[in-house]
Amino acid sequence: VTWSETENIKWKTPLPGDGQTTPIIWDDRIFLQAAIPVGGETTDFDEKRSTRPVTGRYQFIVLCLDRNSGDILWQKMVYEAVPHQGHHPSTGLAPYSPVTDGQYVWASFGSRGLYCFDFDGNLIWKHALIQMNIRGPFGEGSSPALADDAVIVVADHEDQSRIFAFEKETGAIRWEHDRDEPATWATPLPVKVNGRTQIVTSANNFIRSYDTASGNIIWQCSGLTSCAAPTPVISKGKVYCATGFKGNAFLAIELGHTGDLTGTDAVVWSNNENQMPHVPTPLIYKGIIYTFEEFHNRLSTYDAESGNTIIEGSRLDGIKQIYASPMAAAGRIYVPGREGVTLVLDASDDAAILATNTLDDEIDGSPAAIGNELYLRGRTNMYCIAAN
């Protein structure tokens, strides 16, 4: 429950470059992504797109760490270039998280391509993606998802958006489809419905669910606001989608339907009144939905079945900004903040703060837990937290 730089740290590993990856863990391996500045030429500030200027060349890397010791087992550079667009200082150029099936690991760097490695760090295949034009200073950020034997990548931006399904072992494109959407940052969610895998995507115009085999749209539903960043979550046959930029929206949609579900009984409940998260994905734990409003550090909770509000906009003392998505384990909710503070909440009706823990790093990646160990990726360090 408690830790600091000097308490209950099993190991701490300095990482090259900068990143906001959620640690992806399989057995004794941890996979991360990062971007390393290497200097050199710069790009001009693009006032039309309101992006920040890029300060030089970057190397984009995939890392594998030993889960027991924190040692870096291998580090592979996949791309080096001056990025074509800048980014907000709070985001960076490596906000993506990889995905693995225990044999291979797939890492997307957005406009810099999609890469497949084996667990020994051998590059199996790579595939170029489209160069994205992201409005404002936000940069790119949607991570890939693994659906059956396909790797799914959503590339929503200000030009022609697309969704791709790649054969996981070869990198061949199984299908790709245009999407009528501006930039989004949500990661696609694979769900199994009646023995058939669907891929649910959050976006400004429509939440859509695609058939994994064909890419055909199974259902869609409007109702979200702009700049969709939180990833959909699933619980007990429903998918939950939220947005909190330029308005608020939260929809609970019953799975198993087809067609346009807007305004139908398939939308079990919706909430457009309360402040919803702009960045962190909602958490569902033991029938309760937890949402965190990242800039004002406010917690709201809801009954997942009815949508009834339990806690509305309760300020969380001790934390400033929240980009990481919260995690639940052992009856507790773990909420990392951007300044290095992680709150531990009791998963009860009042969500009381049990501990306030501080590390010397910014934490934007969501935590991961295995057994009695908690893994936190800071911008420059990887931590394994365990009771001494």
Q: Positions of the model-derived regions?
A:
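Noncatalytic, solvent-exposed loop/strand surfaces
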Residues: V1-N388
